[in-house]
Curated annotation (Swiss-Prot):
Compartments (UniProt record): Cytoplasm; Nucleus
Domain of life: Eukaryota
Domain RRM residue range list: 51-129, 139-216, 232-309, 335-412
This protein's name: Polyadenylate-binding protein, cytoplasmic and nuclear
Keywords in alphabetical order: Cytoplasm, mRNA processing, mRNA transport, Nucleus, Repeat, RNA-binding, Translation regulation, Transport
UniProt record similarity statement: Belongs to the polyadenylate-binding protein type-1 family.
Principal location: cytoplasm
Length: 627
């Protein structure tokens, strides 16, 4: 390096000595392979024609409009996109800004990089779509043991003296606190080598930093396995608290030459009972582990084993827990039964008595709440699958204390949830196929501002014959609605849910006339409708609907219905207003227009839909509680 370059490096290092108070030291952190911390490793050289920028470290509240205000003064912006989660639609914390001119992109990086956006310093670099170039780590370096006060900008200012930086990042936790390591990606490998040569081992903010080439996760893992097989560092615990460091060393030096030793102590200088010993060669470390592990010293059995990093220990414990859990599950596979619909008087002893005739029971338990009252379900575990199968065959639907039992093999919660999702998906596919065969999806419209409602929104009744029987005093026809022709009542679908008769208006529960008269109703949908009394606003809306495309008509009507439903104050739950709106959108457009004009007619239909929603919610909650 020239004398001028050396002076520039020295100035950058001096600037980095921040005045902030030092914080508690952290463990030496190894290179991580997380997606967030390797973003710097993923960046690469950019072509001269590119004008697309990656903007990271964004506050979740930042949107496209705010970014346009910030970047548009630089030059003409072609497009801006904040990347969001596909399900929750929440910001992922980064965005792409596209300029028409490459020069504008360069200026944006120069002027706006690390500037505050909603209280957070943003990180801007060229977007590189080619994954092979993004993973090219020739110019990427890794820095660890950084001072916690060093941020992205301070790191960038220090290392920019060695060449053009494509990306620079200090790794942080979820709270935005530095993890004391980071990455710098240079445009050329030569610049990276110069940075390593000049900064590695230097003091930055009173800390000696390590600077080296970034190693990919795959290479790190292979190297880590090699280190595990040839370890020299040993961890010992359960050491006598009266042991001094000299005695601790004497305990291990008989097995080989020691390069370093450390006995952990508290703030008063007393031993914490554990420490580390590093041998010169692997054989000495293995010998110490073999001969000292589980050896009794001063009346205590000590543990001696290969020293592990915290992350490795946590992963190992997690694997052990998972293996134990799977072993336990496989042990009870096919022998553990779930029983529900139990009478409140049945306790664990009575439950065991009922199932005892079918085989040897290892455990039986009725689940109770905090007051000791039965929850109405329990578990019985047999010694063999054959006994469990026999119990299911004999006891399922058997009347015990006046209630039919439900008996089946017990399932894990995640398995039950997966099966339920599959059943829902299958029903949705069946409904879509049936709808496609009739040329549309009646009763299913989801405006962008609220949730729609599935057709035939009715809870199953308790009679077991579906929710739409024929002449039944308990079933009513909607006020003013023409009944379907004979034989066109909706048939029950899966789980008792009704499948709507296409081409017929949907049936809602609520304020109905008695259906025992065979469904004879006054013909005509709008008994209170008066065309001459329509207001100017309603005529305008009718004209808009008439001129709007067919696929937009329901959306327009939904935007009129939704605030009217919310204004009633009765749809208190978050999803209630949206679902009720979706139900009412199943009506014909003319009838919806009449509802918007006639408050009395609107209230009648609203109460019907609200009643149906509440009944459905109660049945859903009951089904969830049983499961």
């Amino acid at each position: 390096m020239s004398a001028a370059d050396a002076n520039q490096v020295q100035e950058s290092l001096e600037k980095l000595n921040l005045d902030s108070a030092p914080v508690a030291s952290t463990e030496e952190t190894e290179q991580t392979a997380s997606g967030e911390t390797e973003e710097a490793a993923d960046s690469a050289q950019v072509s001269d024609t590119s004008a697309s920028l990656y903007v990271g470290e964004l506050n979740p509240s930042v949107n496209e409009a705010l970014l346009f205000e910030i970047f548009s003064p630089i030059g003409q912006v072609a497009s801006i996109r904040v990347c969001r989660d596909a399900v929750t639609k929440k910001s992922l914390g980064y965005a792409y800004v596209n300029f028409h001119k490459f020069e504008d992109g360069e200026k944006a990086i120069e002027d706006l990089n690390y500037s505050l956006i909603e209280g957070r310093p943003c990180r801007i670099m060229w977007s590189q779509r080619d994954p092979s170039l993004r993973r090219n780590g020739d110019g990427n370096i890794f820095i660890k043991n950084l001072h916690p006060a060093i941020d992205n900008k301070a790191l960038h200012d220090t290392f920019t003296a060695f060449g053009k930086i494509l990306s620079c990042k200090v790794a942080t936790d979820d709270m935005g606190i530095s993890k004391c390591f980071g990455f710098v990606h240079y445009e050329t490998a030569e610049a990276a080598e110069a940075a390593i040569e000049n900064v590695n081992g230097m003091l930055l903010n009173d800390r000696e930093v390590y600077v080296g080439k970034h190693i990919s996760k795959k290479d790190r893992e292979s190297k880590f396995e090699e280190m595990k097989a040839n370890f020299t560092n040993v961890y010992a615990k359960n050491i006598d608290l009266d042991f001094s460091e000299e005695e601790f060393k004497k305990l291990f030096e008989a097995y080989g030459k020691i390069t370093s030793i450390y006995l952990e102590k508290d703030h008063e200088g007393k031993s914490k009972g554990f420490g580390f010993v590093n041998f010169e060669n692997h054989e000495s470390a293995v010998k110490a582990v073999d001969e000292l592990n589980d050896k009794e010293i001063n009346g205590q059995k000590i543990y001696v084993g290969r020293a592990q990093k915290k992350r490795e220990r946590l992963e190992e414990l997690k694997k052990q827990y998972e293996n134990t859990r799977l072993e336990k599950l496989s042990k009870y596979q096919g022998v553990n039964l779930f029983i529900k619909n139990l009478d409140d008087t049945i306790d664990s002893e009575k439950l065991e008595e009922e199932f005892k005739p079918f085989g040897s029971i290892t455990s039986a338990r009725v689940m109770v709440d905090e007051t000791g009252k039965s929850k109405g379900f329990g578990f019985v575990c047999f010694s063999s699958p054959e006994e469990a199968t026999k119990a299911i065959t004999e006891m399922n639907q058997r009347m015990i204390y006046g209630k039919p039992l439900y008996v089946a093999l017990a399932q894990r919660k995640d398995v039950r949830r997966s099966q339920l999702e599959q059943q829902i998906q299958a029903r949705n596919q069946m409904r879509m196929q049936n709808a496609a065969a009739t040329g549309g999806i009646p009763g299913q419209f989801i405006p962008p501002m609220f949730y729609g409602q599935q057709p035939g929104f009715f809870p199953p009744n308790g009679r077991g014959n579906g929710p739409f029987p024929g002449p039944n005093p308990q079933m009513m026809m909607p006020r003013g609605q023409i009944p379907p022709p004979q034989g066109q009542w909706p048939r029950p679908g899966p789980n008792g849910q009704p499948v709507p008769v296409y081409g017929m208006p949907p049936v809602y529960g609520g304020d109905f006339n008695n259906g025992a008269n065979g469904g004879r109703q006054q013909r005509g949908y709008y008994p209170n409708r008066n065309q001459n009394q329509k207001g100017r606003q309603q005529k305008d809306l009718a004209a808009i609907i008439a001129n709007a495309p067919a696929d937009q008509q329901k959306r327009i009507l939904g935007e009129e219905l939704y605030p009217k439903i919310v204004s009633t104050g009765k749809a208190q739950e978050p999803e209630a207003a949206g679902k009720i709106t979706g139900m009412m959108l199943d009506l014909d457009n003319e009838e919806i227009l009449a509802l918007l004009e006639d408050d009395e007619l609107f209230n009648t239909h609203f109460e019907d839909a609200l009643t149906a929603f509440e009944e459905y919610k109660k049945s859903s909650e009951a089904a969830t509680a049983e499961n």
